[in-house]
Regions:
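Gly/Pro-rich turn-and-neighbor structural signature
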Residues: 3-70
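Alpha-helical scaffold segments in carbohydrate-active enzymes
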Residues: 20, 24-27, 31, 176, ...
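A generic local secondary-structure boundary/capping motif
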Residues: 21-23, 56-59, 73-77, 91-95, ...
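Structural beta-strand/beta-sheet cores of well-ordered domains, especially the beta-sheet scaffolds
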Residues: 30-32, 65, 83-85, 100-104, ...
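Conserved catalytic-core segments centered on acid/base and nucleophilic motifs
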Residues: 59-61, 65-81, 85-88, 132, ...
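A short core secondary-structure module
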Residues: 72, 76-123
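Glycine-rich beta->alpha junctions and the first turn(s) of the following alpha-helix
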Residues: 125-219
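C-terminal helix-coil-helix/basic helical segment that borders enzyme active sites and/or dimer interfaces
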Residues: 223-240
Protein backbone atom coordinates (compact mmCIF):
# COMPACT_ATOMS: atom_id res chain seq x y z
CA UNK A 1 0.00 0.00 0.00
CA UNK A 2 2.51 2.61 1.16
CA UNK A 3 5.30 1.74 -1.26
CA UNK A 4 2.85 2.38 -4.12
CA UNK A 5 1.81 5.70 -2.58
CA UNK A 6 5.47 6.72 -2.30
CA UNK A 7 6.04 5.72 -5.93
CA UNK A 8 3.01 7.76 -7.02
CA UNK A 9 4.39 10.82 -5.22
CA UNK A 10 8.11 10.50 -5.99
CA UNK A 11 8.48 8.27 -9.07
CA UNK A 12 10.41 5.65 -7.10
CA UNK A 13 10.29 1.86 -7.62
CA UNK A 14 9.64 0.65 -4.08
CA UNK A 15 6.38 -1.14 -4.82
CA UNK A 16 7.82 -3.37 -7.54
CA UNK A 17 10.78 -4.17 -5.29
CA UNK A 18 8.42 -5.18 -2.53
CA UNK A 19 6.29 -7.29 -4.90
CA UNK A 20 9.40 -9.17 -6.03
CA UNK A 21 10.44 -9.60 -2.41
CA UNK A 22 7.03 -11.02 -1.52
CA UNK A 23 7.11 -13.44 -4.47
CA UNK A 24 10.39 -14.89 -3.20
CA UNK A 25 9.07 -14.83 0.38
CA UNK A 26 6.02 -16.87 -0.59
CA UNK A 27 7.96 -19.24 -2.85
CA UNK A 28 10.33 -20.13 -0.01
CA UNK A 29 7.51 -20.17 2.59
CA UNK A 30 9.41 -17.84 4.91
CA UNK A 31 8.42 -16.41 8.29
CA UNK A 32 9.08 -12.77 9.15
CA UNK A 33 9.09 -10.58 12.24
CA UNK A 34 7.85 -7.00 12.05
CA UNK A 35 10.66 -4.85 13.43
CA UNK A 36 9.11 -1.50 14.30
CA UNK A 37 9.50 -0.20 17.87
CA UNK A 38 12.61 1.97 18.21
CA UNK A 39 14.55 2.46 21.45
CA UNK A 40 13.25 6.09 21.39
CA UNK A 41 15.22 7.48 24.35
CA UNK A 42 13.66 10.68 25.71
CA UNK A 43 9.99 10.32 24.76
CA UNK A 44 9.45 14.08 25.03
CA UNK A 45 11.84 14.65 22.11
CA UNK A 46 11.58 13.85 18.42
CA UNK A 47 14.17 11.64 16.67
CA UNK A 48 16.27 14.60 15.47
CA UNK A 49 16.24 16.11 18.98
CA UNK A 50 17.72 13.08 20.77
CA UNK A 51 21.19 13.30 22.31
CA UNK A 52 21.99 9.99 20.59
CA UNK A 53 20.70 9.96 16.98
CA UNK A 54 20.88 6.15 16.90
CA UNK A 55 17.99 5.76 19.35
CA UNK A 56 15.87 5.54 16.21
CA UNK A 57 17.10 3.35 13.34
CA UNK A 58 18.49 5.62 10.65
CA UNK A 59 20.37 5.72 7.36
CA UNK A 60 23.98 6.81 7.94
CA UNK A 61 25.13 6.58 4.33
CA UNK A 62 24.12 5.29 0.91
CA UNK A 63 25.81 4.42 -2.37
CA UNK A 64 25.00 2.78 -5.70
CA UNK A 65 24.74 -0.66 -4.06
CA UNK A 66 22.56 0.12 -1.06
CA UNK A 67 22.35 1.87 2.29
CA UNK A 68 24.07 1.60 5.68
CA UNK A 69 21.76 1.68 8.71
CA UNK A 70 22.43 2.05 12.42
CA UNK A 71 20.28 1.88 15.55
CA UNK A 72 18.14 -0.52 17.55
CA UNK A 73 14.59 -1.82 17.67
CA UNK A 74 13.07 -3.04 20.94
CA UNK A 75 10.71 -5.82 22.06
CA UNK A 76 10.58 -7.58 18.70
CA UNK A 77 8.51 -10.74 18.94
CA UNK A 78 10.07 -13.92 17.48
CA UNK A 79 13.12 -12.08 16.10
CA UNK A 80 15.34 -14.96 17.24
CA UNK A 81 13.49 -17.64 15.32
CA UNK A 82 12.20 -15.99 12.16
CA UNK A 83 13.66 -16.12 8.66
CA UNK A 84 13.34 -12.43 7.80
CA UNK A 85 13.28 -9.09 9.60
CA UNK A 86 10.97 -6.50 8.02
CA UNK A 87 11.93 -3.10 9.40
CA UNK A 88 9.42 -0.23 9.49
CA UNK A 89 9.26 3.33 10.86
CA UNK A 90 7.67 3.63 14.27
CA UNK A 91 6.15 7.13 14.08
CA UNK A 92 5.39 10.23 12.01
CA UNK A 93 8.46 12.10 10.81
CA UNK A 94 9.26 15.69 9.88
CA UNK A 95 11.39 17.18 7.12
CA UNK A 96 14.36 17.24 9.53
CA UNK A 97 14.04 13.49 10.00
CA UNK A 98 14.61 12.08 6.52
CA UNK A 99 17.47 9.87 7.71
CA UNK A 100 15.04 8.03 10.02
CA UNK A 101 12.52 7.45 7.23
CA UNK A 102 13.63 3.97 6.25
CA UNK A 103 12.04 0.59 5.62
CA UNK A 104 13.75 -2.58 4.49
CA UNK A 105 13.86 -6.37 4.84
CA UNK A 106 16.83 -8.62 5.53
CA UNK A 107 17.46 -12.21 6.66
CA UNK A 108 17.59 -12.51 10.44
CA UNK A 109 21.17 -13.83 10.29
CA UNK A 110 22.40 -10.93 8.15
CA UNK A 111 25.90 -9.57 8.74
CA UNK A 112 26.13 -6.87 11.44
CA UNK A 113 22.68 -7.59 12.84
CA UNK A 114 22.79 -8.45 16.55
CA UNK A 115 19.80 -10.05 18.26
CA UNK A 116 19.75 -9.76 22.06
CA UNK A 117 17.12 -12.25 23.10
CA UNK A 118 14.75 -12.41 26.06
CA UNK A 119 13.14 -15.83 26.37
CA UNK A 120 10.22 -16.85 28.53
CA UNK A 121 8.85 -20.31 29.14
CA UNK A 122 5.87 -21.70 31.05
CA UNK A 123 6.48 -23.68 34.20
CA UNK A 124 6.48 -27.45 33.98
CA UNK A 125 2.97 -28.88 34.28
CA UNK A 126 2.61 -31.09 37.37
CA UNK A 127 -1.08 -31.91 37.62
CA UNK A 128 -3.14 -30.75 34.64
CA UNK A 129 -2.11 -31.46 31.07
CA UNK A 130 -1.98 -28.35 28.87
CA UNK A 131 -0.57 -29.31 25.45
CA UNK A 132 -0.95 -25.78 24.05
CA UNK A 133 0.92 -24.27 26.98
CA UNK A 134 4.15 -26.23 26.73
CA UNK A 135 5.98 -23.84 24.40
CA UNK A 136 7.66 -20.62 25.41
CA UNK A 137 8.12 -17.44 23.42
CA UNK A 138 10.71 -14.72 23.08
CA UNK A 139 11.23 -11.12 22.17
CA UNK A 140 14.47 -9.34 21.43
CA UNK A 141 16.38 -6.14 20.91
CA UNK A 142 17.58 -6.02 17.31
CA UNK A 143 20.71 -3.93 16.82
CA UNK A 144 21.86 -2.68 13.43
CA UNK A 145 25.59 -2.03 13.65
CA UNK A 146 26.35 -0.11 10.43
CA UNK A 147 24.44 -2.77 8.54
CA UNK A 148 24.49 -2.86 4.75
CA UNK A 149 21.10 -3.19 3.03
CA UNK A 150 21.07 -3.72 -0.77
CA UNK A 151 18.71 -1.48 -2.74
CA UNK A 152 16.49 -4.36 -3.83
CA UNK A 153 15.54 -4.81 -0.17
CA UNK A 154 14.92 -1.11 0.57
CA UNK A 155 11.28 0.03 0.52
CA UNK A 156 11.61 3.58 1.89
CA UNK A 157 14.62 5.85 2.09
CA UNK A 158 14.13 9.47 3.05
CA UNK A 159 10.45 9.95 2.19
CA UNK A 160 9.69 11.35 5.64
CA UNK A 161 6.10 12.35 4.91
CA UNK A 162 5.19 8.65 4.58
CA UNK A 163 6.79 7.55 7.87
CA UNK A 164 3.61 7.79 9.90
CA UNK A 165 1.54 6.34 7.07
CA UNK A 166 3.73 3.22 6.91
CA UNK A 167 3.82 2.87 10.69
CA UNK A 168 0.03 3.03 10.93
CA UNK A 169 -0.53 0.78 7.91
CA UNK A 170 1.16 -2.02 9.81
CA UNK A 171 -0.44 -1.15 13.14
CA UNK A 172 -3.94 -0.95 11.66
CA UNK A 173 -3.62 -4.31 9.91
CA UNK A 174 -2.25 -5.81 13.11
CA UNK A 175 -5.20 -4.47 15.12
CA UNK A 176 -7.65 -5.76 12.53
CA UNK A 177 -6.27 -9.29 12.82
CA UNK A 178 -6.68 -9.01 16.57
CA UNK A 179 -10.40 -8.42 16.06
CA UNK A 180 -10.59 -12.13 15.35
CA UNK A 181 -8.31 -13.60 18.02
CA UNK A 182 -8.85 -11.33 21.01
CA UNK A 183 -12.61 -12.00 21.34
CA UNK A 184 -11.79 -15.72 21.41
CA UNK A 185 -9.22 -15.14 24.16
CA UNK A 186 -11.82 -13.15 26.07
CA UNK A 187 -14.27 -16.04 25.71
CA UNK A 188 -11.73 -18.30 27.42
CA UNK A 189 -11.18 -15.77 30.20
CA UNK A 190 -14.94 -15.37 30.71
CA UNK A 191 -15.33 -19.13 30.89
CA UNK A 192 -12.66 -19.31 33.59
CA UNK A 193 -14.33 -16.50 35.54
CA UNK A 194 -17.76 -18.11 35.27
CA UNK A 195 -16.42 -21.49 36.40
CA UNK A 196 -14.58 -19.91 39.33
CA UNK A 197 -17.72 -18.01 40.35
CA UNK A 198 -19.69 -21.26 40.24
CA UNK A 199 -17.15 -23.03 42.46
CA UNK A 200 -17.31 -20.14 44.93
CA UNK A 201 -21.09 -20.23 44.94
CA UNK A 202 -21.50 -16.66 43.67
CA UNK A 203 -22.42 -17.28 40.03
CA UNK A 204 -25.90 -15.85 40.61
CA UNK A 205 -24.72 -12.63 42.25
CA UNK A 206 -25.63 -9.45 40.40
CA UNK A 207 -22.18 -7.83 40.35
CA UNK A 208 -20.60 -11.02 38.99
CA UNK A 209 -23.20 -11.42 36.25
CA UNK A 210 -22.97 -7.71 35.39
CA UNK A 211 -19.21 -7.87 34.87
CA UNK A 212 -19.46 -11.03 32.77
CA UNK A 213 -22.16 -9.42 30.62
CA UNK A 214 -19.95 -6.35 30.19
CA UNK A 215 -17.02 -8.52 29.06
CA UNK A 216 -19.27 -10.40 26.63
CA UNK A 217 -20.42 -7.10 25.15
CA UNK A 218 -16.85 -5.90 24.68
CA UNK A 219 -15.86 -9.14 22.95
CA UNK A 220 -18.80 -8.95 20.55
CA UNK A 221 -18.15 -5.28 19.78
CA UNK A 222 -14.51 -6.01 18.93
CA UNK A 223 -15.54 -8.88 16.65
CA UNK A 224 -18.21 -6.74 15.00
CA UNK A 225 -15.74 -3.89 14.47
CA UNK A 226 -13.41 -6.26 12.64
CA UNK A 227 -16.17 -7.43 10.31
CA UNK A 228 -17.39 -3.87 9.70
CA UNK A 229 -13.87 -2.67 8.91
CA UNK A 230 -13.47 -5.42 6.31
CA UNK A 231 -16.90 -4.93 4.73
CA UNK A 232 -16.61 -1.13 4.60
CA UNK A 233 -12.98 -1.07 3.44
CA UNK A 234 -11.80 0.69 0.26
CA UNK A 235 -9.04 -0.15 -2.19
CA UNK A 236 -5.70 1.61 -2.05
CA UNK A 237 -3.92 2.73 -5.23
CA UNK A 238 -1.92 -0.51 -5.12
CA UNK A 239 -5.15 -2.49 -5.47
CA UNK A 240 -4.89 -3.81 -1.94
Amino acid sequence: IVTKEIDDAHGTEYCQRFVEYIKNYQKKDLIAAAVQTDAKGDRSKRPHEQVDPDLYVRVVSKNKDGIIVRGAKEDITMASYCDELIVLPTRTLTAEEKQWAVAFAIPADWDKVHIINHASAPRERKFLKAPLNTHGSSDAMVVFDDTFIPWDRVFMCGEHEFGGRMALAFATSHRHSYCGCKPAVEDIIMGLIALTAEYYGVADKHHIREKLAHLAGIAELIYAAGIAAAVESTKASSGT
